Regions:
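Residue-level signal for inorganic ion chemistry
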Residues: 8, 38, 57, 94, ...
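Phosphate-binding loop of NTP-binding sites
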Residues: 9, 89-218, 223, 229-235, ...
Length: 460
């Protein structure tokens, strides 16, 4: 939202010198990507201090910079400096003010997995009738979420915002900024256990979104998740549910697996069913789709419209992308991983025709003290899913290979994505089906890049 600097300074309680008529056309915390006319916030991160890049931001056309009062003396030319106690807090304060000024429905989405895909589906369905702002990528933390809120414009009728967390209290802080009218919780899984003592503690952290909803708000909950299904008990607003197994307000029936093309099913609500086609892989994607339909129904989208919208979805970057290469079918799902998501994708392979089903499984991070056992159990589930070979990549992925071996599934462990890529170059054959999945920190896409690059070289 464009704001005059005088108005922005007022909302942030900032002081300083600036041109009276100057206007911020956007907002940035990154001097590398800042655009002319944007307001630069010199926030301090874990490794970098934005105050070191103020001059660079001005060189790229920043209209002004928000700096801390204690750092003001670093700058000889103090024109176009807005001073505050803490630039990050000022960014958040301005974002919260813009959200209140905008004043229209905002849907907040959280969960241990599926947040980004569900956000995309919700926005896609609402866009049938409305102008929707959605958070970009997975910008879902105390830096990214305020920047998304500052993109709100009067013409936007809805906002769909993803909320992530690693520690208790973080969802509440994000919700205090975003003021969601509707909260969606996808599921609770053993993710970030490095920072929590139990899954129940993770659930309590996710519940902060529901606690933050207004009395007339809407809670959209997974009826099949043992934790999320309980979130509506003490909520005084409207509770609507989605699921496949337990009774739910929105469910799927007659699920037909269609291999790499995804699935088809009847979306059922209030006794009415509409056949839908979903070009995303795995049972977890059906849950995400049902969550999206459930939100759409709350805001005037018909069941027919919502169900038909699913057919035009596409997989996001490194999120279940299906690639045909050198006679093999590749499923690039290496954006992130956790035990539940890996299991869902592995089970999806069972419905796909293939000469061999190969799983390239990277280490899953932030699982806490039980991480080794969780990796091992994922490996044990490879056999029943018809997996032919498991390639474990880095660290605790060795336990995935060991678990798979117990179920007579052959495997190999390598230390790096580069070694995995070299193995793929030499061993994948036409007709193979290959799944790549790992936590973001493993950078498993390097294996895919190496494989496709080297294989292309070999073919010339």
């Amino acid at each position: 939202m464009k704001l005059g600097l005088a108005r922005a300074a007022e909302l942030m309680q900032a002081s300083g010198q600036y041109e009276a008529e100057a206007v911020a056309v956007g907002y940035s915390i990154d001097s590398r990507t800042i655009q002319p006319g944007e307001l630069f916030f010199a926030v301090r991160g874990e490794r970098l201090d934005g105050h070191d890049f103020v001059e660079q931001a001005f060189g790229k056309g920043a209209v002004a910079a928000v700096v801390s009062r204690e750092s003001k003396t670093r700058f000889v030319d103090r024109a176009k400096l807005l001073t505050v106690d803490d630039p990050l807090r000022a960014l958040q304060k301005l974002a919260a003010a813009v959200r209140l000024i905008w004043g229209k429905p905002l849907i907040g989405i959280t969960g241990s997995a599926g947040k980004t895909t569900t956000k995309e589906i919700v926005a896609h369905i609402l866009a049938n009738r409305h102008n929707v702002l959605k958070s970009q990528g997975n910008l879902n933390n105390h830096f990214g979420l305020p920047l998304q809120l500052l993109k709100l414009e009067p013409e936007h009728e809805f906002a769909v915002i993803e909320m992530g967390m690693s520690h208790a209290g973080e969802i509440r802080a994000l919700a205090d900024l975003a003021r969601p009218d509707c909260g969606v919780v996808t599921l609770v899984a053993p993710v970030h256990l490095e920072f929590f003592e139990s899954i129940a503690d993770i659930a309590r952290a996710k519940y902060e979104l529901i606690e933050s909803l207004p009395a007339g708000g809407i809670a959209v909950l997974n009826a099949d998740d043992p934790y999320v299904s309980q979130f509506g008990r003490d909520f005084h607003g409207k509770v609507v549910t989605f699921g496949l197994q337990k009774p739910a307000d929105v469910s799927a029936r007659g699920i037909e697996a269609r291999g790499p093309s995804g699935s088809a099913f009847d979306v059922v609500s209030n006794g009415q069913g509409v056949r839908a086609t979903l070009p995303l892989l795995g049972e977890h994607s059906i849950y995400n789709a049902l969550a999206g339909v459930t939100v759409g129904l709350q805001y005037g989208i018909s069941l027919q419209e919502a169900a038909e919208s699913l057919a035009s979805l596409s997989a996001g970057d490194k999120r279940g992308q299906v690639i045909e290469f050198a006679g093999a079918t590749i499923i690039n799902d290496c954006y992130n991983s956790n035990p539940k998501a890996l299991d869902s994708m592995v089970r999806a392979l069972a419905s796909m025709p293939a000469q061999r089903r190969i799983v390239v499984a990277g280490e899953m991070l932030e699982l806490g003290t039980g991480a080794k056992d969780l990796h091992y159990e994922n490996g044990r589930r490879m056999g029943p899913a018809g997996v032919s070979f498991v390639l474990g990549v880095r660290g605790l992925a060795r336990s995935i290979v060991e678990g798979a071996a117990e179920e007579q599934v052959h495997g190999k462990f390598v230390e790096s994505p580069e070694q995995a890529g070299a193995w793929l170059v030499e061993n994948v054959r036409p007709g193979d089906l290959v799944l790549l999945k790992a936590s973001r920190g493993v950078r498993l896409e390097r294996a895919l890049d190496l494989w496709m690059g080297k294989s292309a070289d070999k073919s010339h």
